[in-house]
Amino acid sequence: MRRFAASFALLGFLLSTAAVAGGEGRVCKVLPQFLDKKGRQSLSPSLYERDAYQAYLRKHPQLRTGLRLEVLWKARGVDWGKTKLRAELRGLLTNSLETVTLEEPVKKSGFFGRWAEFNLTGDEFGKFGKLVAWRVTLWEGDRQLSEQESFLWSGVPAR
C-alpha cells in the first residue's frame, strides 16, 4: 500500500512540474509540393503516384500553378488562442530573391500531430519564382516552440 501511495505521489509531482513548464510543440515534417492547373499535387492518393507526379511537375514548369507546403506538427499544453504556424519561403526570380511569409492559426485536435497547409498560388506564385529555401516555425504568442528549415535556409541571405 505504501508503494502505491508513493507511486501516486510521484506521478502527481511529475504531472504538476510538466504543467508548470508551459506548453511544448514540434514541427515534425515539411513537404514542399507543386500544384497543377487543377490545384492537385497528385493524381491519386498513392504516395508513389504523388512522388512521380511531383517529379513530372518539376520537369514541366509550365504545368505548375502553385506551391503547397504540407506541415505535420504537434503541440500540447499551449494556449490555443495564441498558437500559430509561420512559413517563410525564399524564391528566386531572375536575379531577385523574394521572401514570402505565410501564417496560419492552429486548432486543438487529437492526441497525435496534425497536418496544416500553406498555399502559394495565382499572382503570388508567378512573382515568387523557384523555391530556394524554406523555414516553418510554431509559435505560442511571442515564444517560438519549434522550427524546421531546409538545409539551404541558413546559406541564403534574406533581403
Predicted regions and their residues:
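Short beta-strand elements
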Residues: 144-159
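Solvent-exposed serine/threonine-rich low-complexity stretches and specific carbohydrate-binding patches
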Residues: 98-109, 150-152
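Internal, hydrophobic beta-strand segments that form the core of beta-sheet-rich folds
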Residues: 130-147
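Bacterial N-terminal signal peptides
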Residues: 7-16
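A eukaryote-biased signal for short, well-structured alpha-helical docking elements
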Residues: 22-44
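Extended low-complexity, serine/threonine- and proline-enriched intrinsically disordered segments
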Residues: 79-99, 136-138
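Short, solvent-exposed, Trp/other aromatic-anchored flexible loops in extracytoplasmic proteins
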Residues: 107-130
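Contiguous beta-strand segments within globular domains
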Residues: 42-82, 113-120
